[in-house]
Structure formats: C-alpha cells, structure tokens
Amino acid sequence: MSDFVLTCESAADRTREFFASRNIPVVCFHYEIDDVVYTDDLYQSITPDEFFAQIAAGAMPKTSQVSVGEYEEFWEPFVAEGKDVLHLTLSSGISGTYGSACVAAQMLADRYPQGGKVRVIDSLAASSGFGLLAECAADIRDGGASLDETAAWIEEHKLNLHHWFFSTDLSSYLRGGRISAASAIIGTALKICPLMTVDCEGGLSPREKIRTKKRAISEMAKTMMAHVQDGADYSGKCILSHSACREDAEAVAALIEELVPQLKGKIEINNIGALIGSHTGPGTVALFFMGDKRVD
C-alpha cells in the first residue's frame, strides 16, 4: 500500500471509472457557455455529443483554471490527516494552473506545519496524454515506490510522452488564435488537416499541413513509428482521444494496431474532455504514446 495520495485534474481526459479504479482523486476545471458556468466533471452532467453539438451550433465556451482556493479545498482533507500528496497539473505551456497549485500547496504547508505535504509536478502534458502519465505514475506507486521515487520517475520520463493530433474542423482553432483567418479559409478549402504536437515546453506546436483526412491518419501512424524505440515491436501502451469523431479515431487505431501488433492491449479510445474540447471543437483526433524524448 502506498504511503501517499496521487491526484490529478479533469483535463487528463480519462473516464471517471478509470480514476476511481486507480485511486486517483481528480480536481475539476470549469467552462462557461452563454454566461452559465459548468464544471468539467468528466461528462457526468453532459454527454460528449451534447457538448460538441453546442459548439457546432455556434456556442463559444470560455474556460477557467482551478483556483488556489479550490486546490486548497481539494487537498486539505488529505493534508489535515497527515497524508502526503503528489499532484500532477495540466501543462504550464497550456494553462496557468501549475502556478495556482504551487501557491495552494505552500498555503496548506503554512496552515498545517505538522500535516501532510503537497508536491506539485508540471506534467507538460494534456488530454489523454496527461491521463497516460497519471496511469504510469499510478503503476509506479502501486509497485511500492515512495512519493519521491514516483516523482523522480515522472520528472525523468514525462518528456517521453508524445502527443500528436490533427483536426478536420479548424473553426475553434481560429477562434482561439491558434491559426490565422487566412490559414483557416485556405485550410478548409484545400481540406488541410494540420498535424500538431505538444512540444518540450508543453505548448501546442503545428508541425505539418496535410491534405485530406486519409493522409493525416496515415501520417499520424508513421509519426508514431518514427518515435517509439522499438518500431513495430513497440510493446507499450497507446491511447487515442477524439472530439465527436470516433470513426476517425477508430481508423487511426486500426492502422496502428496493424503496424504495431505487440501493443500493450487494444488501443483505448477516449472522448476529449470539455476543457480541452472547448479549444479544439469537434473534429480532432489525438494520439498518445511513450517514445523518445521531446526535444523541440
């Protein structure tokens, strides 16, 4: 039995059942649609299809990070009982939540000098990639590692976690300032599906402009083959997430499972959560796996 509590955030885009089964408490982000604030509660109060249908109909969600007070409230029961906490945050290259978490951890340390301590790690990850890193951390913890040992493993390996994604709908990327209006118009006209990644600083980085979804799916699989250490003999885990385009995710999964038959289990396909989905909109497919280190 581990002697610490492993926690993370709703932006990790895994199911409620997954987090419960791995004993990982989750703190939730928030989003706002038409002046109404909602909790990013892992689709407990709304379905993914309903959420993305609102965006497709013109809704423009605004997101907000977890506040210092919410972190305090989330961790205080553990700290007050003398339990140490290891917390993983959404990438600092995407959100300012890492800074808020660090402030809250210090405030609890001041309030409970004899209580448990909270150690905060910037995951430099997002969506189900963040969730895959949390799963790896739980595996290390459940293998008997201490908090310090688990934290050291995460810090050493978090840049081995790859994120690759493409989108067939550039509307939300345009609204969020990820691409220019000209790029969106040209991209839509030419059926361009930009291939993007999360770089070594945890920020979003466009890599290739690919014409047609079919080619984007093929290129995504080739990119994975180029970054996993054992190529077709890769035996690690692979996860996909999507925003209201499961058939596209299934096409990627089928191709990768054909190319990499030694994968650890079938590829898990998740829904992109409401926080990340507020920025991607519908039409995004994302691939996550452990490979060589991200260097740019």
What are these regions (language model features)?
Residues 34, 93, 202:
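Positions that flank functional sites
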Residues 3-5, 11-30, 97, 101-106, ...:
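Mixed-charge interfacial surface used for oligomerization/domain docking
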Residues 45-52, 75, 80, 107:
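A short glycine/small-residue-enriched secondary-structure motif
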Residues 89-91, 121-124:
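Short beta-strand->loop
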Residues 5-70:
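N-terminal glycine-rich anion-binding loop in soluble enzyme alpha/beta folds
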